[in-house]
């Protein structure tokens, strides 16, 4: 399976045994100014969701699209 791995159109073919694409999002100390931290990648199984985190998993090529960022005000 092919998954996105950064906030660009940067994709990679997952290693053997990793057939799930995931998107993990959470807030850090800069959440109010920068938005949520986003991690994209491949895994053998869907990562476990921790309190305060969002996790989305899928298993088709390029299915973990990077979320759209809000536009900054000038």
UniProtKB/Swiss-Prot annotation:
Record flagged with keyword GTP-binding: no
Localization terms from the record: Secreted
Keywords tagged on the record: Acetylcholine receptor inhibiting toxin, Disulfide bond, Ion channel impairing toxin, Neurotoxin, Postsynaptic neurotoxin, Secreted, Toxin
InterPro entries referenced in this protein's UniProt entry, alphabetically: Snake_3FTx, Snake_toxin-like_sf, Snake_toxin_con_site, Toxin_cobra-type
Recorded superkingdom: Eukaryota
Pfam families recorded: Toxin_cobra-type (PF21947)
Main location: secreted
Any GO molecular function: ion channel regulator activity
Disulfide pairings: 3-21, 14-42, 27-31, 46-57, 58-63
KW NADP (keyword) present: no
PROSITE patterns per UniProt: SNAKE_TOXIN
One cellular component term from this protein's GO annotations in UniProt: extracellular region
Tissue: Expressed by the venom gland.
Similarity comment: family membership: Belongs to the three-finger toxin family. Long-chain subfamily. Type II alpha-neurotoxin sub-subfamily.
Known role: Binds with high affinity to muscular (alpha-1/CHRNA1) and neuronal (alpha-7/CHRNA7) nicotinic acetylcholine receptor (nAChR) and inhibits acetylcholine from binding to the receptor, thereby impairing neuromuscular and neuronal transmission.
Listed name of the protein: Alpha-elapitoxin-Aa2d
